[in-house]
Structures are given as C-alpha cells and as structure tokens.
Amino acid sequence: MNNRGAVTDMISQLPEPLILQILGSLPTKVAITTSVLSKQWQSHWKMMPKLEFDSFLRRLDLENVTKCLLSHKAPVLQTFSLKVRLDRRNNAVDIGCLIGIAMTRNVRKLVLEVYFHRGTFTFPRSLYHCETLETLELILNVVMDVPPSVYLKSLKTLYLLAVDFKDDESVINLLSGCPNLQDLVMRRNSSSNVKTFTIAVPSLQRLAIHNGSGTPQHCGYTINTPSLKYLKLEGSKAFESFMVENVSELIEVNITDVSEIIDEKLRVFLTSVTRLSLALSPSVFTFPTGIIFNQLVYLEICTNKTSWWKLLPLMLHSSPKLQVLKLIDDTDGMNYVEASGEWNQPKNVPECLHHLEKFIWEGYKWKREEIEVAKYILKNTNRLKRAIFSLKGISSEDRLVVVEDLKSVVMATTNSCQFQFI
C-alpha cells in the first residue's frame, strides 16, 4: 500500500461525523473529488451538510451542480450557496431548477449571488413556499417579481443586498409572507423601482438598512415593527423620507453617515433607547435640538468623522443617565487624516459625567483634540470605575508617556479609577 493509500485508510477509520467535518472544511468541488479514493469514499461527500459553488473563482457548469444536488443524500441540507453570473451557458431557468432541488433537500440556509442584466428574474414558486428555510441571503443584480402568495414560516434571517424589486407590492408580498422573521439586513442599490420600502413585520427584532451614495432620494421607508429591538441606519440623505409607525420596544440604535433624521416619531423613539452608536460628522448631520435621551446608559461615538468632538458635548449634555462612554476609531494610522479645529470644553460639566462608570477609547492616537477630550472626561468624573485605552496606533516609545500623562489626571482627583491600556 502506498503512502496515499495508507493515509486514506487511516482517515476511513474515523467516525463519519468527523469525516464530514473534515470534508466540510474543504471547498465543495475538492470534497467531491475524494469520491475517487475508494468505493467507500464515493458516498461520504453526499452526506455533507453544506454545499457551496462559486463560478466567480472558476468557470461553473450549472449542469454539474444539478447532478451534485440530485446525488445529495443527507436528510437535511444545512447550507446551499451559489455564486453565478448568468450568460448563454448558465441561464435563469437553470438557477430556478437548482433552487427547486435544494428545497426538496430540506435546505436550512440558502445563499444566492446572481448577476443578470436582462430584465426581471422569476424564482420558482418553491422558494416562496419552503417550510424548512431559516436563512435566506440574496445578493442579486436582478429585479425580483414576487407573487402575493408567499409563505416562509421558518424564515428568521433575511439578507437583501443590492436586490431590486419590480414594484412596491413585491416588497410587501415578500415580507408579509415571513411571519417569524427576526433579522432583516438591506443594502439598497443605485437604481430602484421601489418608491416606498414598507417593512411591516410584527416579529422583526433586528433591522439594518444601508443606502449607497447612489440611492435615489425619492426612495422612502415605512417601518411598523412593534418587536424591534435593534435598528441600524447607514448612508447619505436617502432617509429624508423615513416614517416610523411603531418601534416601541427599540433598545439599541446605530446611525452611520446619515445627514438628517426628519421623522419626528423616530426622534421620539430615540429618546427611549438605552444604547446608541453614532458615526456622524456635525458638519453634515443636523442634530435635533431639545432632545433628551433619558434612558441612554451606553453611548458610542466614532472619532474618525470630521469635527466629531463637536458632537460629543451635545450628546453628553443630552444623556443625563449615561454610565458607559465609548469613543472609537477603527482606522489604522496610515489612513488617519488629522482634522482641523479644536475641542471647546463645555461651560458647564454635563450631568452624566458625575455618575459615569466606564470610559473606553478604542483607537486613541494621542492627537491634540483627543488629549484634551480624554483629560476633560477623566478630570470631571468622580465615580469612574474603569478607563480603557487602546494604544495600538501609538509607538512603543511614546506609550509610557501617554500612560503617565493620563494617569496623572486621575491622581489629581479623588477618583479611584482603574486603568487598562491595551
């Protein structure tokens, strides 16, 4: 027996669940080729819980993918992922057949990335009536025409990335047919047939909406999600038409690169959240005047936005019950552009600093305005328990100076804060 045969024989003695785990760590096309090792190995790949095919990496014949799906014998197909560009060789009918076969294999998660530039794309009816599908990820350069009779009772997670719909009704048809949907992630493309994206899902708990820079400004949103706990809004001025009807359970909000929030109801709901993350530039974003975040205990502000230090005092004064403040800059030192301007400390110390318990600065770069902000906060807190600074962007020679400089501020007060530098 040669060395390859000996290794193959040793692997064959492993428990089948472990063999399937090993095969699952390989690209699907590679795992399938193990069937030539021996007669015993001809069936192992057919029990794999995950099948992934990517024509972007290598030319893919959908006929071969169909044969693989038809040969699959596992009682449940946990994941079926297909990335394909439709052309003369691979057409929409082939995609429809593959989806239909996957549904008969009790697929739990379907990931479909399709690029198609000619007209609408009609999915097989089986996609809209699958009882086992729990996660659906659609990355489509296509137009979806969704029928009114949709029922995906097990679907809990839905990604719609660069997906366009035939009209407003197609959106309503899809979402109304998902009675147990909990997570929805949307990334709108630059050309949209949908004027108002209606999200009326009573079960929805997490919603993320990203508008690209090319998203038409006439595109609006209507949100009615009474169970929603997390909301993320990202992108340009496209949120000018944004209507919130019911988000009474909202706890956490993340807002990134949004110029203005017009809807008064959303402003009201923002005042009831306990966690808020902002990546905004005050020079672009219109801060709502007179708003008080009475329930806010956790605030995160991104420090790589222009004039971010002007937003900070506004939020501190508006958040009287704040307990945790996190400032974050996830850009590396090579991409850092020092903003012009200076920190003007508030005339009156914000009430929240008197009972702030935790101060985190991730990506502290020891810039002038950062030093002023850090010292102001450390100096004016008297209940601060922990201060955590990430100094990865600072040279090892300067770190000791930075540490001593920050600690000296607290030593001059009655604060018994514990420092952590990482």
Curated annotation (Swiss-Prot):
Coiled coil: none annotated. SUPFAM superfamilies: F-box domain, L domain-like. It holds the Pfam family FBD. Keywords: Leucine-rich repeat, Repeat. Gene3D superfamilies: Ribonuclease Inhibitor (3.80.10.10). InterPro entries: F-box-like_dom_sf, F-box_AtFBL13-like, F-box_dom, FBD, FBL13/AtMIF1-like, LRR_dom_sf, LRR_FXL15/At3g58940/PEG3-like. Residues 342-391 form the FBD domain. Residues 8-60 form the F-box domain. LRR repeats lie at residues 132-153, 154-175, 180-201. This is Putative FBD-associated F-box protein At1g55030. It comes from Arabidopsis thaliana (Mouse-ear cress).
